[in-house]
Regions:
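FIC/Doc superfamily catalytic core
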Residues: 1-167
Length: 167
């Protein structure tokens, strides 16, 4: 814990890491349909496992989130590219850590972490939707000015800003 300085997770020993990484890679690249796991759940498991294994001295969280994004993009979840789940995790670091600790302390019941991650994704999707709605409103407001011959979208937006703040 970065606030209290207490150790909240002890990763596997260095002798276990290589095998665990090999198993994680096999899991991430397994394309069989025999035991279907929804891609969002599987991406979350990959995220959790790399963070659990902690194979690097630094950057395990960033790498785990990168693998999460990679897997979803690989599976066709293109909107993931525009999500900022890292921002959500940063804003709720305590909840992220609790989900991880609960999963580890409750006989490795990863459902805590999956639940947290699904909520983080929902918040991120909601933020993206709100941003897109704001951009659409800006564009719509600028269209009044883009109707003027020779004025492009960006110029129309700037003219609208001036019109909204006349001083």
């Amino acid at each position: 814990n970065s606030v209290t300085g207490t150790i909240v997770h002890t990763p596997p020993t260095h002798t276990q890491i290589e095998q665990m990484i090999e198993e994680l890679c096999a899991f991430a690249n397994d394309e069989s349909t025999e035991n279907f796991i929804h891609p969002i759940i599987k991406a979350t498991i990959i995220h959790f496992m790399l963070a659990y294994i902690q194979p690097f001295v630094d950057g395990n969280g960033r790498t785990a989130r990168s693998l999460f994004y990679w897997y979803l993009l690989k599976k066709g979840y293109w909107l993931t590219e525009y999500l900022s789940i890292s921002r959500i995790i940063y804003k709720s670091k305590s909840s992220y850590e609790k989900a991880f600790i609960y999963a580890e302390s409750d006989m490795n019941d990863i459902s805590y972490f999956i639940h947290y991650n699904l909520n983080a994704m929902q918040k991120s999707y909601d933020q993206l939707k709100q941003w897109l709605q704001r951009q659409a409103l800006k564009r719509q407001a600028a269209q009044t000015y883009t109707a003027i011959d020779g004025v492009n979208d960006r110029q129309g937006y700037i003219l609208r800003l001036f019109a909204d703040q006349p001083t």
